């Protein structure tokens, strides 16, 4: 039965993308089928095989060491505030972002990341039926982040039509940045985080190919990556350290605000209607949770977490998943965890539109106009990845 429901779910989510398509007759079926097959193969390897366990284990172990090194710096500054017997979200989850961001800066300075991004993007362009710019952007978004990636493309932004701009922004919203992957791994199992990273990369291309199909002419398929201003090693290091700290503080501020507001709204709804706001959202999202393979008896609670992620952010939803006492089955936990690993939420519309507008005001206004369609597509990417996990777990 789970296979039947999962297949129906895939058809529904792809169908919802088709309904919103701006050019149904231009959709290229072959790349979509190839990428779906790759999603199933890679997802199965990562979740169900010894090779996958080895790769995920190595990835998680590496990040584990990085988090230990990050703790050295945190302990030095905050001393006794870090209690080994208690978990402080800001100290243990958010502040390591500072160290991870510093490492990314070093790898950028030494041209390691640009090399990896460029050639993985080139390989992806052979599979996804899109231009090299779109493929580069998807890989760069997964490493640099949804706003930082546009800085490397600022020369291209003014030359892009609305269709190509949508694809770039959709890729940025569907993925997550490497600087906060370590934070996710303190809240979710590493295998779910890694699987989501891979599935969302291809899922972003699949949904964008359906919602926003277009052909890139050979003469337009140019990739001119903006070289960063020449800086010394320590200038780059200092810049990325401060960027990492800004991210940690911004996420902390967003969490304080969103968690408090959701608690307030829940209190009002409980007093007036006898059910929390998140409970109502759970019923709204329950059919979608069911379609990704979650049993109906868990669908309402799972749907509540999924909806929380969309209206607030993934950190609030992950906190809800880990701390609210849900006793989900292993399969449901895997599906929900994979769904949560993306930037698909309302606040990301403002972040991406603001990042683009800071580089090109006209294009920033264009992004703001299709913001809801952007969130719609990115959310379908999360549902698609979750449905695939539901089928292969």
Curated annotation (Swiss-Prot):
It comes from Bacillus subtilis (strain 168). Induction: Induced by deoxyadenosine and thymidine. Repressed by DeoR and glucose. It is a multi-pass membrane protein. Keywords: Cell membrane, Membrane, Transmembrane, Transmembrane helix, Transport. GO terms for biological process: nucleoside transmembrane transport. The lineage of its organism: Bacteria, Bacillati, Bacillota, Bacilli, Bacillales. This is Nucleoside permease NupC. One of its GO terms (molecular function) is nucleoside transmembrane transporter activity. Belongs to the concentrative nucleoside transporter (CNT) (TC 2.A.41) family. Its main location: membrane. Transport of the pyrimidine nucleoside uridine. It comes from the Bacteria. The chain crosses the membrane at residues 3-23, 32-52, 87-107, 168-188, 191-211, 249-269, 272-292, 334-354, 372-392. It is found in: Cell membrane. GO terms for cellular component: plasma membrane.
